């Protein structure tokens, strides 16, 4: 049965009643807190921090990047299982180490017909970066969960011990060549070679499947061995 319609008198009374007439009886309790804080999510804070770097000076930017590179050097010199190189990766440190090592391995020549050892610089540069790219691709094919540039960052920074070995060998060669000198250089190169391998595997060990770690470590061993051999056989 359909509901009965309102009479004309009731409709006129409802129309004449104010719209907010009942709100005057509503009271707000004093116990209800009406103050609060506006929180900014961490991601929004990170974006705000990134945008604030656009306004900083060039000197401050360079110093900040150099400090970050220095901290990563310390992680390599004191290797331990850490995600520092993987989380805050960069290619400035590997580029600096690669250029420095290539310059120290470059032979100088006073013969005008030679180009001063330019191909040797290019050879070292290509070997380092081509080897790092090959190891990274091998890691990805084996099912590693590390990104391409993270792997390049770790492999590049772990050349630091070999740079130290090259510097020591050049200083030893200033005293002349001989069997004792060669044995000292051999010991230094082997020590720094082991240091580079241990440091790189400490950062990359957890990124590979447990049953394929040996297949991932072997190219790393070969990569640093080739660089160590170039350092050991260097003659000014």
From Swiss-Prot:
Predominant subcellular localization, coarse grouping: Golgi
Topology feature Lumenal, residues: 106-116, 169-185, 235-236
Spans through the membrane: 85-105, 117-137, 148-168, 186-206, 214-234
Topology in membrane: Multi-pass membrane protein
InterPro entries referenced in this protein's UniProt entry, alphabetically: Yip1/4-like (IPR045231), Yip1_dom (IPR006977)
Annotated positions of the N-acetylalanine modification: 2
Gene Ontology BP, a term: intestinal epithelial cell development
An example Gene Ontology molecular-function term: identical protein binding
Cytoplasmic side stretches: 2-84, 138-147, 207-213
The entry's keywords: Acetylation, Golgi apparatus, Membrane, Phosphoprotein, Transmembrane, Transmembrane helix
Domain of life: Eukaryota
Subunit structure as annotated in this protein's UniProt entry: Predominantly interacts with YIPF1 or YIPF2, but may also form a ternary complex with YIPF1 and YIPF2. This interaction may stabilize YIPF1 and YIPF2.
Function: May be required for stable YIPF1 and YIPF2 protein expression.
Protein's UniProt name: Protein YIPF6
